[in-house]
């Protein structure tokens, strides 16, 4: 693992402390590395109406996007699970749209890690090219 990935995981672990997860007690922290070196973080926020909550990855990327960031090179996700957790399907779709070429590094609080890519997580994803008309 590179020093940059280790630093990004540390940022995700720190972001995890801000998680609001009273229903599942499954705290998640995420960090995105922009091409200019800026690190954007987020934590999951749950709601009693489960579908209204947001995952840490989407909190981080939406925060970054609304502050002008557009080019991301890496995503880190940290959970307290027994094995590294990858982003959910909705987060994979959002990451494909805004960070398709990013590396994804996931880790547990115990230090177990996994490295992959956004495209590997969603190999046949729906993107702008899917909207092209054949008529």
Describe each region flagged by the PLM:
Residues 27-34:
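Short beta-strand scaffold segments in enzyme catalytic cores
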Residues 44-58:
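Compact, glycine-rich, soluble single-domain proteins
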């Amino acid at each position: 693992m590179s020093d940059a990935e280790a630093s990004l995981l540390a940022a995700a672990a720190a972001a995890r402390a801000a998680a609001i997860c009273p229903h599942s007690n499954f705290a998640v922290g995420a960090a995105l590395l922009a091409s200019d070196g800026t690190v954007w973080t987020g934590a999951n926020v749950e709601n009693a109406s489960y579908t209204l909550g947001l995952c840490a990855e989407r909190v981080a990327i939406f925060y970054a996007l609304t502050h002008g960031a557009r080019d991301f090179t890496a995503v880190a996700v940290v959970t307290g699970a027994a094995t590294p957790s990858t982003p959910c399907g909705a987060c994979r779709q959002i990451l494909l749209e805004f960070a398709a070429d990013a590396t994804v590094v996931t880790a547990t609080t115990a230090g177990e890690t996994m490295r992959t890519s956004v495209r590997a997580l969603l190999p046949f994803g729906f993107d702008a090219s899917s909207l092209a008309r054949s008529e």
